Amino acid sequence: MRGVAFAVIGLLAGIGYGSVSAVSAWPLESAAQDPAADARKAAEAIDTSGKPAEAEVAWRKVIATQQARPKPDPETIALAHNRIGDTLYYRGKPDLAQKELEAARDLLAAAGLGEGDMMSETLSNLGTMHTAQGRPASDVELQRKALAMRVKLHGPDDTRLAINYYNLGYALYEFGQPLEAADSIELGTRMRLATMKPDNPDLFLTLATAAGIVESSGRVLTAIEFAQKAVELVNTHHPKHPYAGFVRGVLGKTLTGAGRSAEAIEVTRQAVDELAASMGEENPLTLDAIGNLAVSMARLGRFDEARELTMRSIPKKREERAPDTVRALITASNYAGEGGREAEAIAIAEDGYAFAAKKMPPDHAIRAQVAFVLAIHLERSGQLKRALELMQETAAIFAKREDAESPRRLGADVYLGGLEIANGLRQQGYARVAAAADKMAPKMFAIAQDPALGASNSYYETFARAAEAAIQAGHPGDAFRYHQLASYDVNVLASQQVAMRTAAGRSSEAAALVRDLQDAGRTLRVLNRQKAGLLARGDVEGARRSDASIAETEAKSAQLTGRIEVIAPGFERLSRPEIVPLATLQSRLAKDEGLFVAMPSRSRTSVMLIRRDGVKVAVSAKPRSAIRPLVTAVRQSIDTALNSGETTLPPFDFAASHALYAALFPAEIRSGATGLTRLHLAATDALASLPFAALVTQPVRGTGDRALRDARWLIRDMSLDVTVSMASVGAGGTPISRATAFAGIGAPALTGTPGKPIELAGLFRSGRADVRAVRGLPPLPGAMAELSQMRAALGGERSTLVTGADASEARIKTMDMSQYSVIAFATHGLIANQVDGLEEPALVLTPPNEESVGEDGLLTVSEIAALRLNADWVILSACNTAAGSTQSAPSYTGLAHAFLYAGTRSLLLSHWQVRDDAASRLSVATVRGTASGLDRAQALRQAMLALIADRKVPGGAHPAVWAPFVLIGA
């Protein structure tokens, strides 16, 4: 969490240890008639965070009534000064709050109460005011002193120490010691959670602040636990509290940290609106929420928006929030770099570095972070010596402050080693890289296997940098291993899960149990996402039902694991991630077969060409910020052609296509490709949405039909397929023949106008699919013929067609799909967020006459994943079936991942909306080619080349028509 000083929330206001001794000093028989007692009771009934001005008046009355007594109680007066300090703090006046706390301290000391609970609380709160004014070092000193007092009084485990552990944790966090801070603040938070009433507003504020701090130390699950509990308490007891937006913003931040950015945006936007209304635009909490929204935007690839939001989150009076200012400048610099604004990125980072040097101690963690970011940008601009010095500064600070295996420290070592290599210290640098990267791998795998988190690309950048270093240091085997680690995403995990079922025996009890266990893990991820959305919307009862379902599913998982371990003792070994050694992969490749690896990072793009008899490697100077616009340009020229409605299609962007080819296939790689007839592709980031077949290997003159037909497309040189898992490369797909069991599904009964553009705006009503709108989608006249021709190519004895009114969700879900080795869907494909209300990709089937539970005409990703398949090949002749959620999303997410998980070993998908005549031509020709003995990749290549050459097909030579399909896992 950015450094909004909220350790005091609930700590200044809540525990009231001094009040215990103060009350006991008053005669019980007279307490009811005592004006001082009445004043205190009235003051304690007012929420200091929700109504600070009213609370201040009430607590000043407590002081006045005490001073009117013959013998004023010093502890009660000290307590009142503490509470008044609360009210001033909540109104942004920590300097005035400090004076109140100093008055309390001096009063207690003069009364001989310098070692009691009230003094401990006062010192703790006083220290927090120091941090609020930019003095965290003195805060840490005061917090340790306050904690020592209470330990002496009560021992280290007494719950009355919660305030001290909590405030010490926050002080350590602001002082730049996140790991020790997380230990202390988590202990204090759990103590408070166990002892405080759920309707006490201090509790939800405690949980929210703790969530932000433990998340920054890498404890993602604990952060989500605390944040979700905080939102639940707000929704239940304090929906109109002025800090409700703050709590929601913390939940959004923790969701983003867990790789759940799409969910986080909804929560955080609500937080920004609530905070702006209750606190004002310049309030630190509002600015913090704006910064968190920027992070979520960036995770979805929206870097310009993210940079603008981040700069907006910087306070006008930067000096008053120095740590926050530097953090925001670091973040804005990163976003500028990712958006291709390199000069701006350096300028912002230089500003942050200079500001931190003036305002922060030399060994502060934020100094390390800003030096790290500036070093990366300077390296990219060729300033290697200064970049190395800055990265050495970063590593030295992290080595002093963080655990030896903390992700930040290990990441800094990877980058430091890379810079040492760049500065000529090759052996020393690579030893550092290898040691750090190897320690990070188990951490990444643990997160990927966790049901609440799952595989993501959060470690991508560090392993990509390690791969670059390995290439530069001459270690191609290690570079290949690091590429696999960087690319360990949901599809690799799905392929691994299918392999586990196969190893257990496809028809065995063990395989069924393994599938049930994997389904339970998938269900847990869905339930956790649902819970976050319910909490964001204030649905307390729904969130509680989710909790019950989560607990039930976790118990089921534990039971299944126990049963599997009994009947399949080797299961644990099978469940470990598999990283394929370079030599093993080479041994699987045929002489004319190669694997091409491309990994864009923020600094450069590393590429490898692996053949049976050798490896070629190169590092391109183009970072992903340069690669992404080129991919976008190619895709935009295709989209323009698709949307033109003209017989003669608009020009293809040959310049961008060739620029990409030149960047990805430099001379070193091209020299190794001679004689290849088949190339497996393992490309990440935006390259996953690139139709490699449409790269031109030579510059093209002209833009017309002749230029398109004569262009030297990469597909002319070799067949192409995309690999999901290195374990399957070179293994060879199962050949198909006329005896293959085939299921053709599609040509749904729709009533719209054929050929009319799809109108999506009315598909959903109140968050659910409108079956009438689904039925009104345009039919696909060629789909029936397409499926029939595939069936004819494969033979009819073991084949079936499910079309028209029969092609419904109910039919598909009740079919025994495991008996078909080839399955084809010919229908519309919809991607998530293409229409409001559609939260996941879907295939369109025939909708029911009336809406019913579980059947609305859309076969979604979740429903596809629940199918039990045993297919060698699934063909999705539909729109956008290869689409991921963003440029930076794991490759081929959505429908592809669902079919892989369901039990598919190979897929034919479309990158974009496929013209009906082209879809039929390409898919049928590919199936016919495979039935005649060609491998799938070669069959697809020949189908593409035939379409390019056929002058009878309008626009057939344009990649928009012939290049939509991609073969995955061939």
Regions of interest found by a model, annotated:
Residues 63-67, 105-110, 147-152, 189-194, ...:
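Amphipathic alpha-helical segments of tetratricopeptide repeats
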Residues 568-970:
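Catalytic cores of enzymes
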Residues 292, 304, 311, 322-323, ...:
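Alpha-helical solenoid repeat scaffolds used for protein-protein interaction
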Residues 22-64, 68, 75-83:
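N-terminal leader/linker segments that initiate helical-solenoid repeat arrays
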Residues 40-48, 76-90, 117-132, 159-174, ...:
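Conserved alpha-helical positions within TPR/SEL1-like repeat arrays
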